[in-house]
């Protein structure tokens, strides 16, 4: 055939119309007419497939077919083809030589070529005669015409099965078609045509292997394709078919023609399995896909071109010339595509193709194929005679042919439209780039190169309107219900353009349009094409859709029309009816657009996708717009069309117009079908296929038709019976329908909106708003969409909207029950579940009514207000999905669906396969029975629990008992689950499973061993198990795959707590999923209940203090595993807090318990030896705690809000701020605070009552504020302050913090607002921290200085008067940290209060921040962000800390310990750490905080910097991410001022009474740390790093060393001191400070170091802050203090150079620089001073701490670490290390003494320490670090001596000024310019006065640390400590610099670097030695 066809082509130009031509040419003709014949022949020979595309526009269509065939050929017959191509080429050349003029006379030539090709394929020769005889006078159009048919009748033909489309049956079929459709008698076409048809249909039977491209295309359904491919069959019919097909895509016929003309190709096709049309089509397509096609074009192009040229020349000479003109341009255009591959070949192709095209054009012209296509094949029928030859090509009318000439090749067009290649590798004809995989193609089509090539293509073919043509195709397809004809008509031009369409076909069958058009050309092809197209389009439609999304709207446009046409062929009536229904529903236009865009968007329903336009790319984006539309109703395509490019719009319009015409026609039918049409919206983002939709609704009845509008994510479904629609609507009321796991919304098109609303309302009613409905947000990223149960609650949709849960204020944080706010938006009740439980709680508390931001209607769900509706939003979509399902189920249960709920039961499906099944498949098991409510798939146990209506369950059991179902080879066992089974209670199900495995398991005590892990990937169970095994044996586990959740049962509660703490501090990512971890919510249920009480509110502060718990609770809440009841019962925060609290002090009073929760330190202290004092404090603390906890509850809400904000970031920030706003009463509260202060001082009970009242007020205010999310960020701070004042210390802290906060708070709030605006709290915080730090630093410093100066006496008095109160405040500040978070904003309050608040706040804030960070971040922020945030916090904390540390190391120690403990607590380590750490931490915190009120300045500086970071984080977290931003901002402000003012000395002074407790607490804390080491350490580190990266890191380093020293001793006892490296250091520092306070020397050293840290951090490396005398002391003590300062200051450089990284350096540029300067100093001096080394140790420990959390963990885990720290301290003689070591060990003893002589400690501490340090510095450093008070005292003395030495060394510089004379004033005067330093200086001056009065105690350092705040107030007289001045001391180089610049220059000097390196080396060496000694000693 090929040869004959080819010859006939050569002969055919004139003869083609003749029977021989049809026979020989017919195959070519149908494919490309004469040209196509040549092409087909060349396809085989030269892979003419590509060439045919190039040959002519019609050939482009032809190419479509041939391409496909060729593609297959390429695959199957690549070698044979090559051979044949060669033969064909030679033959063609020969033929060309012979009959150039008579290309249409190819018949003869064909015989010649056949001879040549016969060698390759003998059949060709045989068929060629047949072809000749068959095609002699008739082309496809002529054949059709002979039957009185037109191209449009091809559609009818396509309806015949391929099997029937045999040459024998074809005439009968054609006649039948004629009789039925045309009413004409089908002329008896010669059997030749039938034979030809047979050949076409039976590629094997005839050389026209695949007219059967239809089969190749895989459209067995399309008899048209067969016919098309059987152009030989009735010439008229074939011609018509070809015309239509050519119009459609000319490729299908072309392949046949090509194959025919290229007889060997046909043979090859057959040989290559192309004989079977169906197989050939598909295989051909696949083979041909892109590159092969290109290859064919290239290889076959030239050879084919030459023969074709000759033939074409003759043809051109013939009437075909006109046709060729029309067709040639397309062929040429097509050629360019190919020609890009082979320009020469393309040209050749074009030349020969022109003649061929001419012949085909002649046919087309005569037939008016285009007209025929559009109007029907009447014209083609007419024209086939004169143009019969061309009629093969003429499928394109002359105009079409002309267009073709001007059009690119089909391959080029396919590439232009980004049609998915059918075969890979695909060679982009535009770019000559080979894409081996679809992925590569998708990437390539989005490259600038390809886009530019597309641009050039359009320029190259100005006559080609890629958009218009596709639209025309669409129009043609759509206008004429007989899409085949129309398709062929409109597509033929389009195809000419769309030769690309053939390309597309080749590339991706998904472009149904192209494929379909080829079918259209030949009815058989069309039909088959359609059927296969459908199957393929369905399978590939995603690709198509993807392609459009990829930015290949072209593909969509071209494809959608084809799809539509195919679809029309398949069910044009149905489709019309559907479309009509759509239009009638008012969505007609939109629907048309949808159709067009549909093709562009996704090939859900191939036929449905009209070609939006060649520029379908725009349509890709319209999907997003349409998403919103679909959200509203999914009806209007206007948004999409708007979004679409104008071209696309124009195409869409055109298409829609034609579609409208179709629809109009269909409207009549529509009326019949209208009631049976459904609109499905919110389809999956990744698209769905028609088959998916059918599969979903098949259970309800027969699905007549499906129309998918991908760009709108909508589909129209026509059911056979209206009853099915009713059943569906009823069904969806109770059970959401899901496609690919995403719930879709379903409504009746006409009533779409109304129904959606009704349905969703019904759903809401039925589910009482518990069902979260899907909300389509254009910004899916902004919120998690929770789909109401009505619309399947799908995780995918959960992304779009976040269900907000309003916490009712009355519930307070304790009632964290998440209330589902359901709003009905566009028929969608959307429940936004705050990702973070805190916000949920807040919102839930806020309003019983569920408010949906996106919802048009807020649905009040009073019952739901407390519904936990497990609308626990997971951080991830999975969580959201789970939450959605849980929420829906829960809501359903909680809501009036009680009937349903009562009727609901749980089905157990067991024996599921290990893999290979989807949630949908499990859903499908129950879906047909209706009443499906929820599902829980336990993939780990191969079980699934399905919550379903009882009746349905019974039916289900009966059915599956009778008809067992297999899934992946496993026979499922379906039975009823126990009656009491609650599918939402994942833990209960887990326990059931545990019982099955271990009947003896103790269920009562098992909950505390559960660890809930959410957001797991599908294959993440093993990873999680591996993680769990690191913390202990995993006894049992369950993986809930559909909720992406796992529950592990570890061997002990400690392991669970450790794992939880670790994962909280170190969120783990598995792939793209960040794990969220939580403990069993049931552990905290009691506390949650308590939380409901005012006491519980206290607990909620505690929870805040341990945000980890909140996180856990929230995670629990977020994770479906948390039951709504659990959520209701326990507020998320309180759950975790309680767990920790219960573990720590379950026996404490509720008030105390609350206090403990808020301040575990308080409880611990009580538990500790200081229990009496603590008890005294506890009343105060309790009262304070009550107020604080009430406030904290608010704060907790804020914290929750903060967390929510973290997850929701800015949005929620406003709400969190609202809680603060609720705190707005804080103005009055301030007065109250003062009153509270008095009350607390006077009567703890009164204070408690008062605070409690305030707290309640605050809670109410918070509730109100929550309502007004951003009402007042500042006021919330005030409220916090108000709560804080409840405790004198807390009040002072609050006031201080408020004062600082007010300035900072204003900025912070503003920034917070800004941050709220921003979505990433971390980023905002970071930026804000820096900006605010810089801005607020001066203000904060000034405020802090003033406040500190004021507070110092007041705080000292307060703490002295209420030492326990101080502790209580310390505890309270934990609550307060929440409150202080608020208080931070309200800096206006008295600074002492602020300081106290800040001190406690740091913990609470750290906790909250950490918890929030961890919580929120795990949920909303990527782990990197969390880490970054944590780093930021650490940096902030570090900066603050270094400042504090510099201000006073002791202060740093005491302050940092609380801070760190707060950090640890805040970091979710707090509670766990608090539990273990509570003893120490609580003790410290109490001591610390009691001191902190006094020492608040330094703590405020340091803690405030940290806590501001943390407290402000809390404050700002409640506000929103701003909390953190503000934290960062405030950190800069607070870091310096707070650290300097709230000096650790002050804290220590206040803490001294509790220091005795602290030692036990330390041990306890270490134990706790051991218990919660990882989480706490990690949290602490992360938090510390992130929260107070600047101050904390430096401070943490120093303090950490101290704490580590302390906790090393304790760590020896408690291996888990590790967890709280920072805390440990903090505790140690606190202990040291307390010891120092008791023993002035120790405290002074710590203070000096702390102040140095504070100063260096706060002020530009206020290492000089140490008074010169102190520096001298430090120097005397081997610069121990200086070393501390140096180490701290140096820590940054050391960290940088060594592993020691100063958060300060890292955190803040300014502070970092100052710290570096200080460090430079220190480092320069350190080598000289062992103290410096000690500092380095501290630094290293700190860096380890901060970075690794390892030092603490190591110290905890390894007593070696403690020993190392001690040894390091001893060896290094760092003041910090020594002090820390001494104070750590000595703190235990000294702290008792210090606790007794808290007021005396500053002088004693420093003086004693100095002496001891000098005397027994190194020896005692070791012994002190290991032994205790004596060593500590000695160390303090040594440190003092060293500090003095250092100071002396530094004395010449500013430091001397500051230090000795306590040149605080000088320092202040000297560096007043520095906001922080100046402020610190002024405070230091005050403090210096105090210190001067207490010179013994090394007030210098105390002053430095207290100069920040408390020290002045606490021990104003005794604080001889260095005034935070601008001087800097380099401990490493033992040099003092008056200015930061000088220090910076020094630090940059080579000498300093060398000294630092030496120092680091020495430090490392000493550390190693110490470690070795410790190990040996151990």
From Swiss-Prot:
Q: Where are the zinc fingers (Matrin-type)?
A: 1928-1958
Which Gene3D superfamilies does the UniProt record give?
3.30.70.330, Classic Zinc Finger
Q: Which residues bind DNA?
A: 1353-1477
Q: Name one GO cellular component term.
A: nuclear speck
Protein's cellular compartments: Nucleus speckle
Provide ranges: composition bias, Basic residues: 486-543
SMART domains from the UniProt entry? RRM, ZnF_C2H2, ZnF_U1
Q: Which UniProt keywords apply?
A: Activator, DNA-binding, Isopeptide bond, Metal-binding, Methylation, Nucleus, Phosphoprotein, Repeat, Repressor, Transcription, Transcription regulation, Ubl conjugation, Zinc, Zinc-finger
Q: Which GO terms describe its molecular function?
A: double-stranded DNA binding; mRNA binding; RNA binding; zinc ion binding
Q: Where is this region: Involved in localization to nuclear speckles?
A: 472-571
Indicate, by first and last residue, each region the UniProt record lists as having compositional bias (Polar residues): 610-633, 1113-1122, 1132-1142, 1378-1392, 1408-1417, 1444-1465, 1507-1525
Region annotation (Disordered) ranges = 1-48, 465-638, 835-861, 1094-1148, 1294-1340, 1354-1532, 1793-1823, 1867-1916, 1946-1978
Q: Where is the composition biased (Basic and acidic residues)?
A: 470-485, 570-582, 590-604, 840-856, 1294-1322, 1329-1340, 1479-1506, 1793-1806, 1888-1906, 1954-1978
Establish whether keyword Disulfide bond is in the entry.
no
Q: Which InterPro entries match?
A: Matrin/U1-C_Znf_C2H2, Matrin/U1-like-C_Znf_C2H2, Nucleotide-bd_a/b_plait_sf, RBD_domain_sf, RRM_dom, ZNF638_RRM1/2, Znf_C2H2_jaz, Znf_C2H2_sf
Per the entry, what this protein does is: Transcription factor that binds to cytidine clusters in double-stranded DNA. Plays a key role in the silencing of unintegrated retroviral DNA: some part of the retroviral DNA formed immediately after infection remains unintegrated in the host genome and is transcriptionally repressed. Mediates transcriptional repression of unintegrated viral DNA by specifically binding to the cytidine clusters of retroviral DNA and mediating the recruitment of chromatin silencers, such as the HUSH complex, SETDB1 and the histone deacetylases HDAC1 and HDAC4.
State how it assembles.
Interacts with FHL2. Interacts with CEBPA, CEBPD and CEBPG. Interacts with MPHOSPH8 and TASOR components of the HUSH complex; leading to recruitment of the HUSH complex. Interacts with SETDB1. Interacts with HDAC1. Interacts with HDAC4.
Q: This chain belongs to which protein, by name?
A: Zinc finger protein 638
Source species, please?
A: Homo sapiens (Human)
Taxonomy of origin reads: Eukaryota, Metazoa, Chordata, Craniata, Vertebrata
């Amino acid at each position: 055939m090929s040869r004959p066809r080819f010859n006939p082509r050569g002969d055919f130009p004139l003869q083609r119309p003749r029977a021989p031509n049809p026979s020989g040419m017919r195959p070519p003709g149908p494919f490309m007419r004469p040209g196509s014949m040549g092409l087909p022949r060349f396809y085989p020979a030269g892979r003419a497939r590509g060439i045919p595309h190039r040959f002519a526009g019609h050939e482009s269509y032809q190419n479509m077919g041939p391409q496909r065939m060729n593609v297959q050929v390429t695959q199957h017959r690549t070698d044979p083809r090559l051979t044949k191509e060669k033969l064909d080429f030679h033959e063609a050349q020969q033929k060309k030589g012979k009959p150039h003029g008579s290309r249409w006379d190819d018949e003869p030539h064909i015989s010649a070529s056949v001879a040549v090709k016969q060698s390759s394929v003998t059949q060709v020769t045989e068929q060629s005669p047949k072809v000749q005889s068959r095609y002699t006078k008739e082309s496809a159009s002529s054949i059709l015409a002979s039957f009185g048919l037109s191209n449009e009748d091809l559609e009818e033909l396509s309806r015949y099965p391929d099997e029937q489309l045999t040459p024998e049956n074809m005439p009968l079929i054609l006649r039948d078609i004629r009789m039925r459709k045309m009413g004409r008698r089908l002329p008896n076409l010669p059997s030749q045509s039938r034979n030809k048809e047979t050949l076409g249909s039976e590629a094997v039977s005839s050389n026209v292997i695949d007219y059967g491209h239809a089969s190749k295309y895989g459209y067995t359904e399309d008899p048209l394709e067969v016919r098309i491919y059987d152009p030989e069959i009735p010439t008229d019919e074939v011609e018509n078919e070809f015309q239509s097909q050519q119009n459609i895509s000319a490729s299908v016929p072309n392949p046949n023609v090509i194959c025919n003309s290229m007889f060997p190709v046909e043979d090859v096709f057959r040989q290559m399995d192309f004989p079977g049309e169906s197989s050939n089509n598909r295989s051909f397509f696949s083979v041909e896909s892109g590159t092969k096609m290109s290859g064919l074009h290239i290889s076959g192009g030239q050879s084919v071109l030459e023969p074709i040229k000759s033939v074409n020349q003759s043809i051109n000479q013939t009437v075909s010339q006109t046709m060729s003109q029309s067709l040639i341009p397309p062929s040429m255009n097509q050629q360019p595509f190919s020609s890009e591959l082979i320009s020469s070949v393309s040209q050749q192709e074009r030349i020969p193709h022109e003649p061929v095209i001419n012949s085909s054009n002649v046919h087309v012209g005569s037939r008016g194929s285009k007209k025929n296509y559009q109007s029907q094949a009447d014209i083609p029928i007419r024209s086939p005679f004169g143009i019969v030859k061309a009629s093969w090509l003429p499928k394109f009318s002359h105009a079409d042919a002309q267009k073709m000439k001007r059009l690119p090749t089909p391959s080029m067009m396919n590439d232009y439209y980004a049609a998915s290649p059918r075969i890979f590798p695909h060679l982009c004809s535009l770019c000559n780039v080979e894409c081996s995989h679809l992925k590569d193609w998708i990437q390539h089509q989005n490259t600038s190169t390809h886009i530019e090539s597309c641009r050039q293509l359009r320029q190259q073919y100005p006559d080609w309107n890629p958009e218009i043509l596709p639209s025309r195709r669409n129009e043609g397809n759509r206008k004429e219900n007989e899409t085949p004809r129309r398709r062929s008509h409109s597509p033929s031009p389009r195809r000419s353009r769309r030769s690309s369409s053939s390309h597309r076909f080749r590339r991706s069958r998904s472009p149904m349009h192209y494929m379909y058009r080829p079918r259209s050309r030949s009815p058989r092809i069309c039909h088959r094409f359609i059927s296969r197209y459908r199957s393929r389009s369905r399978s590939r439609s995603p690709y198509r859709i993807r392609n459009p999304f990829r930015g290949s709207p072209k593909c969509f446009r071209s494809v959608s029309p084809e799809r539509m046409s195919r679809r029309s062929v398949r069910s044009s009536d149905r489709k019309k009816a559907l479309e009509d229904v759509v239009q009638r529903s008012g969505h007609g236009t939109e629907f048309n657009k949808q159709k067009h865009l549909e093709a562009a968007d996704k090939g859900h329903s191939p036929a449905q996708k009209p070609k939006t336009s060649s520029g379908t790319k725009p349509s890709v984006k319209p999907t997003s717009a349409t998403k919103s539309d679909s959200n509203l109703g999914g009806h209007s395509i206007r948004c999409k069309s708007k979004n679409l490019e104008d071209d696309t719009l124009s195409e869409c319009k055109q298409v829609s117009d034609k579609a409208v015409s179709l629809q109009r026609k269909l409207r009549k039918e529509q009326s019949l079908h209208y009631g049976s049409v459904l609109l499905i919206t919110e389809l999956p983002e990744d698209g769905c296929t028609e088959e998916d939709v059918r599969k979903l609704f098949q259970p309800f009845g027969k699905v007549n038709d499906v129309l998918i509008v991908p760009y709108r994510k909508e589909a129209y479904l026509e059911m056979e019976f209206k009853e099915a629609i009713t059943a569906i609507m009823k069904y969806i009321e109770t059970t959401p329908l899901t496609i690919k796991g995403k719930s879709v919304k379903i409504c009746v098109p006409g009533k779409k909106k109304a129904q959606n609303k009704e349905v969703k309302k019904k759903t809401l009613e039925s589910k009482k708003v518990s069902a979260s409905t899907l909300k389509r947000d254009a910004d899916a990223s902004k919120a998690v969409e929770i789909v109401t149960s009505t619309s399947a609650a799908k995780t995918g949709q959960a992304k779009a909207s976040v269900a907000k849960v309003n916490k009712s204020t009355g519930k307070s944080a304790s009632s964290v029950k998440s209330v589902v706010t359901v709003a009905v938006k566009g028929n969608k009740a959307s429940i936004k579940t705050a990702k973070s439980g805190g916000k949920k709680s807040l919102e839930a508390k806020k309003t019983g009514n569920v408010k949906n931001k996106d919802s048009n209607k807020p649905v009040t769900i009073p019952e739901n207000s407390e519904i936990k509706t497990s609308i626990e939003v997971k951080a991830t979509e999975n969580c959201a999905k789970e939450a959605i399902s849980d929420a829906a189920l829960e809501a359903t249960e909680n809501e009036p669906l009680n009937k349903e709920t009562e009727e609901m039961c749980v089905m157990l499906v067991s024996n599921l396969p290990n893999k290979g099944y989807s949630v949908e498949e499990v859903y499908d098991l129950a879906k047909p029975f209706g009443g499906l409510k929820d599902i829980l798939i336990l993939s780990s146990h191969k079980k699934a629990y399905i919550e379903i209506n009882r009746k349905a369950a019974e039916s289900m059991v009966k059915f599956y008992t009778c008809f067992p179902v297999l899934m992946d080879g496993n026979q499922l066992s379906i039975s009823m689950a126990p009656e009491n089974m609650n599918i939402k209670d994942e833990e209960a199900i887990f326990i059931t499973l545990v019982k099955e495995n271990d009947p003896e398991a103790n269920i009562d005590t098992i909950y505390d061993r559960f660890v809930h892990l959410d957001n797991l990937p599908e294959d993440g169970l093993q990873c999680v198990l591996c993680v769990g095994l690191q913390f202990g044996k995993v006894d049992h586990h369950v993986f809930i795959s559909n909720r992406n959740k796992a529950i592990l049962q570890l061997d002990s509660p400690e392991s669970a707590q450790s794992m939880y703490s670790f994962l909280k501090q170190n969120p783990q990512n598995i792939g793209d999923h960040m794990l969220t971890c939580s403990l069993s919510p049931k552990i905290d249920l009691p506390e949650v209940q308590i939380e409901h009480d005012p006491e519980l509110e206290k607990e909620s502060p505690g929870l805040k203090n341990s945000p980890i718990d909140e996180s856990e609770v929230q995670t629990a809440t977020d994770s479906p595993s948390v039951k709504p009841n659990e959520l209701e019962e326990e507020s998320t925060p309180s759950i975790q807090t309680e767990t920790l609290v219960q573990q720590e002090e379950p026996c404490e009073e509720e008030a105390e318990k609350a206090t403990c929760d808020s301040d575990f330190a308080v409880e611990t202290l009580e538990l500790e030896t200081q229990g009496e004092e603590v008890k005294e404090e506890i009343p105060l603390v309790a009262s304070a705690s009550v107020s604080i906890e009430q406030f904290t509850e608010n704060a907790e809400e804020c914290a929750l809000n903060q967390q929510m904000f973290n997850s929701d970031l800015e949005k929620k920030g406003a709400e969190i701020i609202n809680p603060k706003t609720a705190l707005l009463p804080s103005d009055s509260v301030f007065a109250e605070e003062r009153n509270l202060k008095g009350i607390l001082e006077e009567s703890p009970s009164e204070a408690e009552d008062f605070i409690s009242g305030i707290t309640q007020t605050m809670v109410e205010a918070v509730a109100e504020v929550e309502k007004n999310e951003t009402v007042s960020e500042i006021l919330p701070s005030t409220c916090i302050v108000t709560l804080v004042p409840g405790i004198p210390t807390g009040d002072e802290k609050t006031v201080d913090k408020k004062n600082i906060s007010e300035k900072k708070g204003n900025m912070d709030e503003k920034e917070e607002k800004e941050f709220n605006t921003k979505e990433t709290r971390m980023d905002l915080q970071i930026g804000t921290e820096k900006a605010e730090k810089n801005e607020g630093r001066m203000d904060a410093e000034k405020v802090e200085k003033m406040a500190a100066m004021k507070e110092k006496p007041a705080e000292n008095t307060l703490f002295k008067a209420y030492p326990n109160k101080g502790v209580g405040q310390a505890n309270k500040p934990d609550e307060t940290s929440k409150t202080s978070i608020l208080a931070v904003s309200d800096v206006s309050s008295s600074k002492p209060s602020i300081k106290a608040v800040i001190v406690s706040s740091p913990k609470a804030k750290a906790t909250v921040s950490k918890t929030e960070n961890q919580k929120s971040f795990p949920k909303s922020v990527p782990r990197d962000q969390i880490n970054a945030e944590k780093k930021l916090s650490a940096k902030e904390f570090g900066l603050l800390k270094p400042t504090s540390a510099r201000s006073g190391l002791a202060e740093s120690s005491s302050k940092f310990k609380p801070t760190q403990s707060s950090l640890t607590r805040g970091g979710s380590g707090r509670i766990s750490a608090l539990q273990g750490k509570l003893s120490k931490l609580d003790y410290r915190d109490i001591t610390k905080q009691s001191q902190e009120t006094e020492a608040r300045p330094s703590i405020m500086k340091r803690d405030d910097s940290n806590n501001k970071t943390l407290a402000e984080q809390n404050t700002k977290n409640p506000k929103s991410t701003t909390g953190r931003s503000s934290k960062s901002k405030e950190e800069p402000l607070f870091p310096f001022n707070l650290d300097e003012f709230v000096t650790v000395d002050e804290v220590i002074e206040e803490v001294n009474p509790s220091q005795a407790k602290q030692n036990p607490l330390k041990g306890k804390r270490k134990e706790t740390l051991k218990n919660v080491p990882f989480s706490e350490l990690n949290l602490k580190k992360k938090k510390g790093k992130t929260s107070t990266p600047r101050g904390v890191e430096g401070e943490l380093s120093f303090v950490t060393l101290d704490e580590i020293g302390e906790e090393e001793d304790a760590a020896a006892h408690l291996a888990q001191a590790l967890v709280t490296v920072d805390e440990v250091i903090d505790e140690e520092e606190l202990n040291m400070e307390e010891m120092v306070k008791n023993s002035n020397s120790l405290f002074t050293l710590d203070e000096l170091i702390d102040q140095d840290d504070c100063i260096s951090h706060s002020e530009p490396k206020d290492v000089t802050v140490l008074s010169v005398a102190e520096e001298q002391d430090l120097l005397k003590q081997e610069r121990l203090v200086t070393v501390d300062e140096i180490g701290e200051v140096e820590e940054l450089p050391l960290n940088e150079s060594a592993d020691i990284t100063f958060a300060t350096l890292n955190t803040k540029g300014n502070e970092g620089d100052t710290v570096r300067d200080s460090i430079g100093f220190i480092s320069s001096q350190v080598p000289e001073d062992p103290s410096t080394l000690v500092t380095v140790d501290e630094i290293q420990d700190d860096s380890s701490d901060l970075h690794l959390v390892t030092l603490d963990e190591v110290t905890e885990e390894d007593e070696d670490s403690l020993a190392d720290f001690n040894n390091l301290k001893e060896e290094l003689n760092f003041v910090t290390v020594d002090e820390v070591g001494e104070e750590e060990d000595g703190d235990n003893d000294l702290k008792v003494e210090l606790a007794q002589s808290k007021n005396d400690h500053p002088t004693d501490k420093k003086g004693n320490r100095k002496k001891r340090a000098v005397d027994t510095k190194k020896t005692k450093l070791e012994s002190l670090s290991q032994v205790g008070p004596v060593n500590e005292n000695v160390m303090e003395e040594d440190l003092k001596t060293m500090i003095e030495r250092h100071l002396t060394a530094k004395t010449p510089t500013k430091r001397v000024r500051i230090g000795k004379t306590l040149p605080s004033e000088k320092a202040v005067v000297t560096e007043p310019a520095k906001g922080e330093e100046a402020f610190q200086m002024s405070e230091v001056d005050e403090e210096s006065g105090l210190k001067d009065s207490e010179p013994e105690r090394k007030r210098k350092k105390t002053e430095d640390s207290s100069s920040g705040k408390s020290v002045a107030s606490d021990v104003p007289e005794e604080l001889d400590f260095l005034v935070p001045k601008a001087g800097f001391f380099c401990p490493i180089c033992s040099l003092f610099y008056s200015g930061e610049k000088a220090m910076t220059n020094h630090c940059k000097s080579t000498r300093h670097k060398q000294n630092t390196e030496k120092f680091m080396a020495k430090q490392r060496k000493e550390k190693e030695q110490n470690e070795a000694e410790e190990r040996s000693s151990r």
